[in-house]
Protein backbone atom coordinates (compact mmCIF):
# COMPACT_ATOMS: atom_id res chain seq x y z
CA UNK A 1 0.00 0.00 0.00
CA UNK A 2 1.38 3.41 -1.01
CA UNK A 3 1.15 6.34 1.45
CA UNK A 4 1.14 10.04 0.57
CA UNK A 5 1.11 13.10 2.84
CA UNK A 6 -0.23 16.56 2.00
CA UNK A 7 -0.03 19.58 4.31
CA UNK A 8 -2.95 21.97 4.02
CA UNK A 9 -1.35 25.44 3.92
CA UNK A 10 -4.29 27.74 3.27
CA UNK A 11 -5.80 29.87 6.08
CA UNK A 12 -9.17 29.47 4.36
CA UNK A 13 -11.17 26.42 5.42
CA UNK A 14 -12.20 24.04 2.63
CA UNK A 15 -13.95 20.69 2.39
CA UNK A 16 -11.44 17.86 2.27
CA UNK A 17 -13.10 16.08 -0.66
CA UNK A 18 -13.18 19.26 -2.74
CA UNK A 19 -9.55 20.10 -1.90
CA UNK A 20 -8.30 16.62 -2.76
CA UNK A 21 -10.25 16.59 -6.02
CA UNK A 22 -7.87 19.28 -7.28
CA UNK A 23 -4.78 17.70 -5.70
CA UNK A 24 -5.35 14.13 -6.91
CA UNK A 25 -6.07 14.40 -10.62
CA UNK A 26 -6.14 10.61 -11.05
CA UNK A 27 -9.10 10.18 -8.69
CA UNK A 28 -12.70 11.32 -9.06
CA UNK A 29 -14.51 13.05 -6.21
CA UNK A 30 -16.54 9.88 -5.65
CA UNK A 31 -13.32 7.83 -5.37
CA UNK A 32 -11.97 10.32 -2.85
CA UNK A 33 -15.18 10.26 -0.79
CA UNK A 34 -15.08 6.46 -0.73
CA UNK A 35 -11.47 6.47 0.47
CA UNK A 36 -12.38 8.96 3.23
CA UNK A 37 -15.40 6.90 4.32
CA UNK A 38 -13.34 3.70 4.38
CA UNK A 39 -10.62 5.33 6.50
CA UNK A 40 -7.88 5.35 3.87
CA UNK A 41 -7.68 9.16 4.07
CA UNK A 42 -7.03 10.68 7.51
CA UNK A 43 -6.38 14.15 8.93
CA UNK A 44 -3.72 14.41 11.64
CA UNK A 45 -4.01 10.65 12.07
CA UNK A 46 -7.77 10.68 12.62
CA UNK A 47 -10.61 9.51 10.42
CA UNK A 48 -12.94 12.29 9.26
CA UNK A 49 -16.19 12.73 7.37
CA UNK A 50 -16.28 13.65 3.69
CA UNK A 51 -17.54 17.14 4.54
CA UNK A 52 -14.76 17.86 7.03
CA UNK A 53 -13.39 21.39 6.57
CA UNK A 54 -9.61 21.55 6.58
CA UNK A 55 -7.68 23.93 8.83
CA UNK A 56 -4.28 25.47 8.15
CA UNK A 57 -1.41 23.03 8.92
CA UNK A 58 -3.65 19.94 8.86
CA UNK A 59 -1.67 16.88 7.70
CA UNK A 60 -3.64 14.73 5.28
CA UNK A 61 -2.50 11.10 5.00
CA UNK A 62 -3.62 9.08 2.00
CA UNK A 63 -3.18 5.30 1.93
CA UNK A 64 -3.75 4.10 -1.61
CA UNK A 65 -5.47 0.73 -1.82
CA UNK A 66 -3.86 -1.86 -4.02
CA UNK A 67 -5.89 -2.22 -7.24
CA UNK A 68 -8.22 -5.18 -7.28
CA UNK A 69 -6.79 -8.05 -9.25
CA UNK A 70 -9.36 -9.50 -11.60
CA UNK A 71 -9.25 -13.05 -12.87
CA UNK A 72 -9.18 -12.33 -16.59
CA UNK A 73 -10.95 -15.12 -18.44
CA UNK A 74 -9.85 -16.24 -21.90
CA UNK A 75 -12.88 -16.06 -24.19
CA UNK A 76 -13.44 -17.36 -27.69
CA UNK A 77 -14.65 -14.08 -29.16
CA UNK A 78 -14.10 -13.33 -32.88
CA UNK A 79 -11.39 -10.72 -33.42
CA UNK A 80 -10.40 -9.02 -36.68
CA UNK A 81 -6.61 -9.47 -36.65
CA UNK A 82 -5.14 -7.42 -39.51
CA UNK A 83 -1.52 -8.48 -38.90
CA UNK A 84 0.37 -10.79 -36.56
CA UNK A 85 3.96 -11.90 -36.01
CA UNK A 86 5.97 -13.17 -33.03
CA UNK A 87 6.09 -9.74 -31.38
CA UNK A 88 2.86 -7.87 -32.05
CA UNK A 89 -0.64 -7.82 -33.47
CA UNK A 90 -2.63 -5.17 -35.29
CA UNK A 91 -6.31 -5.49 -34.39
CA UNK A 92 -9.32 -3.81 -36.01
CA UNK A 93 -11.48 -3.24 -32.93
CA UNK A 94 -15.24 -3.07 -33.50
CA UNK A 95 -17.32 -0.19 -32.17
CA UNK A 96 -18.80 -0.96 -28.76
CA UNK A 97 -16.04 -3.32 -27.55
CA UNK A 98 -14.17 -2.37 -24.37
CA UNK A 99 -10.38 -2.75 -24.71
CA UNK A 100 -9.53 -4.25 -21.31
CA UNK A 101 -11.39 -5.61 -18.25
CA UNK A 102 -12.38 -3.39 -15.33
CA UNK A 103 -14.74 -3.63 -12.39
CA UNK A 104 -17.67 -2.84 -14.67
CA UNK A 105 -16.54 -4.97 -17.62
CA UNK A 106 -14.93 -8.18 -16.39
CA UNK A 107 -15.41 -10.06 -19.64
CA UNK A 108 -16.31 -9.60 -23.29
CA UNK A 109 -13.36 -7.25 -23.81
CA UNK A 110 -10.66 -7.23 -26.46
CA UNK A 111 -8.13 -8.53 -23.91
CA UNK A 112 -10.39 -11.49 -23.05
CA UNK A 113 -10.55 -12.34 -26.75
CA UNK A 114 -6.82 -11.91 -27.42
CA UNK A 115 -5.75 -14.03 -24.44
CA UNK A 116 -7.73 -16.91 -25.96
CA UNK A 117 -5.83 -16.38 -29.20
CA UNK A 118 -2.24 -15.94 -27.95
CA UNK A 119 0.11 -14.89 -25.14
CA UNK A 120 0.48 -11.15 -24.48
CA UNK A 121 3.11 -9.00 -22.78
CA UNK A 122 2.86 -8.79 -18.99
CA UNK A 123 4.12 -5.23 -18.44
CA UNK A 124 0.66 -3.77 -17.80
CA UNK A 125 -0.26 -6.57 -15.40
CA UNK A 126 -3.14 -9.01 -15.58
CA UNK A 127 -5.79 -6.41 -16.44
CA UNK A 128 -4.19 -4.77 -19.47
CA UNK A 129 -1.73 -7.30 -20.90
CA UNK A 130 -0.28 -6.26 -24.24
CA UNK A 131 -2.13 -2.95 -24.38
CA UNK A 132 0.33 -0.33 -25.61
CA UNK A 133 -2.27 2.35 -26.36
CA UNK A 134 -6.04 2.46 -26.01
CA UNK A 135 -9.06 3.67 -27.93
CA UNK A 136 -12.45 4.31 -26.36
CA UNK A 137 -15.19 1.68 -26.30
CA UNK A 138 -17.26 3.44 -28.96
CA UNK A 139 -14.25 4.27 -31.15
CA UNK A 140 -13.54 1.61 -33.76
CA UNK A 141 -10.40 0.77 -35.69
CA UNK A 142 -6.75 -0.18 -35.56
CA UNK A 143 -4.87 -0.87 -32.35
CA UNK A 144 -1.32 -2.14 -31.68
CA UNK A 145 -1.00 -5.01 -29.18
CA UNK A 146 2.35 -6.30 -27.86
CA UNK A 147 2.89 -10.06 -27.51
CA UNK A 148 6.04 -9.82 -25.38
CA UNK A 149 7.67 -7.39 -22.95
CA UNK A 150 10.56 -6.43 -25.22
CA UNK A 151 8.20 -5.30 -27.97
CA UNK A 152 5.95 -3.57 -25.43
CA UNK A 153 8.77 -1.45 -23.99
CA UNK A 154 10.01 -0.42 -27.43
CA UNK A 155 6.52 0.39 -28.74
CA UNK A 156 5.79 2.54 -25.69
CA UNK A 157 9.02 4.46 -26.28
CA UNK A 158 8.15 4.91 -29.96
CA UNK A 159 4.71 6.32 -29.12
CA UNK A 160 6.22 8.69 -26.55
CA UNK A 161 8.79 9.83 -29.13
CA UNK A 162 6.07 10.39 -31.77
CA UNK A 163 7.43 7.61 -33.99
CA UNK A 164 4.01 6.03 -34.50
CA UNK A 165 1.69 7.82 -36.95
CA UNK A 166 -2.02 7.41 -36.23
CA UNK A 167 -4.84 8.74 -38.39
CA UNK A 168 -8.58 8.70 -37.77
CA UNK A 169 -11.82 9.21 -39.66
CA UNK A 170 -14.21 11.51 -37.81
CA UNK A 171 -17.70 12.65 -38.74
CA UNK A 172 -18.36 16.04 -37.15
CA UNK A 173 -21.15 18.57 -36.82
CA UNK A 174 -21.11 21.61 -39.08
CA UNK A 175 -19.45 22.39 -42.40
CA UNK A 176 -15.73 23.05 -41.93
CA UNK A 177 -14.73 25.84 -44.31
CA UNK A 178 -10.98 25.18 -44.59
CA UNK A 179 -9.68 22.04 -46.30
CA UNK A 180 -6.82 21.67 -43.82
CA UNK A 181 -6.20 22.78 -40.26
CA UNK A 182 -4.22 22.28 -37.06
CA UNK A 183 -5.61 22.50 -33.54
CA UNK A 184 -2.90 23.38 -31.02
CA UNK A 185 -4.60 23.60 -27.62
CA UNK A 186 -3.51 22.12 -24.25
CA UNK A 187 -5.69 19.42 -22.69
CA UNK A 188 -6.20 18.49 -19.04
CA UNK A 189 -8.86 16.91 -16.88
CA UNK A 190 -11.93 19.11 -16.56
CA UNK A 191 -11.89 20.56 -13.00
CA UNK A 192 -15.69 20.78 -13.01
CA UNK A 193 -16.26 17.24 -14.26
CA UNK A 194 -13.41 14.84 -13.43
CA UNK A 195 -14.49 12.16 -15.90
CA UNK A 196 -14.10 14.58 -18.80
CA UNK A 197 -11.15 16.30 -20.45
CA UNK A 198 -11.09 19.92 -21.60
CA UNK A 199 -8.90 22.56 -23.24
CA UNK A 200 -7.21 24.29 -20.29
CA UNK A 201 -4.25 26.69 -20.31
CA UNK A 202 -2.41 24.60 -17.70
CA UNK A 203 -2.97 21.37 -19.64
CA UNK A 204 -0.48 19.22 -21.54
CA UNK A 205 0.51 20.31 -25.07
CA UNK A 206 -1.89 18.70 -27.55
CA UNK A 207 -1.83 18.94 -31.34
CA UNK A 208 -4.30 17.52 -33.87
CA UNK A 209 -4.01 17.97 -37.65
CA UNK A 210 -7.07 17.51 -39.84
CA UNK A 211 -8.11 17.58 -43.49
CA UNK A 212 -11.57 17.53 -45.01
CA UNK A 213 -12.54 14.34 -46.87
CA UNK A 214 -16.18 15.15 -47.69
CA UNK A 215 -18.74 17.82 -46.88
CA UNK A 216 -22.48 17.50 -46.29
CA UNK A 217 -25.03 20.22 -45.67
CA UNK A 218 -24.63 20.20 -41.88
CA UNK A 219 -21.78 17.73 -41.35
CA UNK A 220 -18.17 17.10 -42.43
CA UNK A 221 -16.09 13.93 -42.77
CA UNK A 222 -12.48 14.62 -41.81
CA UNK A 223 -9.21 12.76 -41.41
CA UNK A 224 -7.36 13.54 -38.18
CA UNK A 225 -3.70 12.88 -37.43
CA UNK A 226 -2.51 12.87 -33.84
CA UNK A 227 0.79 14.58 -33.07
CA UNK A 228 0.17 13.91 -29.39
CA UNK A 229 -2.03 11.28 -27.79
CA UNK A 230 -4.03 12.76 -24.94
CA UNK A 231 -7.17 11.14 -23.56
CA UNK A 232 -10.18 12.00 -25.78
CA UNK A 233 -7.91 14.34 -27.77
CA UNK A 234 -9.81 14.41 -31.08
CA UNK A 235 -13.17 14.61 -29.33
CA UNK A 236 -12.05 17.50 -27.11
CA UNK A 237 -10.28 19.41 -29.90
CA UNK A 238 -13.21 19.19 -32.29
CA UNK A 239 -15.58 20.42 -29.60
CA UNK A 240 -13.12 23.27 -28.94
CA UNK A 241 -13.45 24.52 -32.55
CA UNK A 242 -17.24 24.08 -32.42
CA UNK A 243 -17.33 20.96 -34.62
CA UNK A 244 -18.03 18.15 -32.10
CA UNK A 245 -18.18 14.54 -33.25
CA UNK A 246 -21.51 13.16 -34.39
CA UNK A 247 -23.03 10.91 -31.72
CA UNK A 248 -20.56 11.91 -28.99
CA UNK A 249 -22.46 11.42 -25.70
CA UNK A 250 -19.95 13.46 -23.67
CA UNK A 251 -18.62 16.28 -25.84
CA UNK A 252 -21.35 16.51 -28.47
CA UNK A 253 -24.57 18.54 -28.52
CA UNK A 254 -27.77 17.18 -26.99
CA UNK A 255 -29.37 16.93 -30.41
CA UNK A 256 -27.20 14.69 -32.56
CA UNK A 257 -27.53 11.71 -34.88
CA UNK A 258 -28.01 8.35 -33.19
CA UNK A 259 -24.79 6.47 -33.94
CA UNK A 260 -24.41 4.66 -30.59
CA UNK A 261 -21.45 6.78 -29.55
CA UNK A 262 -18.95 9.05 -31.25
CA UNK A 263 -18.32 8.62 -34.99
CA UNK A 264 -14.58 8.04 -34.74
CA UNK A 265 -12.50 5.34 -36.44
CA UNK A 266 -8.77 4.62 -36.17
CA UNK A 267 -8.10 4.33 -39.92
CA UNK A 268 -4.34 3.84 -40.20
CA UNK A 269 -1.18 3.13 -38.21
CA UNK A 270 2.36 3.56 -39.51
CA UNK A 271 5.61 2.71 -37.69
CA UNK A 272 8.82 0.74 -37.83
CA UNK A 273 8.70 -2.74 -36.31
CA UNK A 274 10.02 -2.52 -32.71
CA UNK A 275 12.28 -5.57 -33.12
CA UNK A 276 13.14 -5.94 -36.82
CA UNK A 277 12.97 -2.29 -37.85
CA UNK A 278 10.77 -3.17 -40.85
CA UNK A 279 8.51 -0.34 -41.99
CA UNK A 280 4.86 -1.22 -41.38
CA UNK A 281 1.70 0.50 -42.61
CA UNK A 282 -1.87 -0.65 -42.07
CA UNK A 283 -5.10 0.97 -43.22
CA UNK A 284 -8.80 0.11 -42.99
CA UNK A 285 -11.87 1.23 -44.89
CA UNK A 286 -14.46 3.57 -43.44
CA UNK A 287 -16.60 1.34 -41.18
CA UNK A 288 -20.13 0.45 -42.23
CA UNK A 289 -21.80 2.40 -39.42
CA UNK A 290 -20.18 5.62 -40.67
CA UNK A 291 -21.00 4.81 -44.30
CA UNK A 292 -24.65 4.15 -43.38
CA UNK A 293 -24.84 7.50 -41.59
CA UNK A 294 -23.34 9.38 -44.54
CA UNK A 295 -25.72 7.68 -46.99
CA UNK A 296 -28.62 9.04 -44.94
CA UNK A 297 -27.05 12.52 -45.00
CA UNK A 298 -26.88 12.41 -48.81
CA UNK A 299 -30.62 11.78 -49.11
What are these regions (language model features)?
Residues 1-182, 289-293:
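RNA pseudouridine synthases
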Residues 125-156, 165, 169, 185-241, ...:
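The conserved catalytic core of RNA pseudouridine synthases
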Residues 198, 246-256:
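Short, surface-exposed loop/helix-turn segments at secondary-structure junctions
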Residues 81, 172, 209-212, 245:
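Conserved hydrophobic positions within beta-strands
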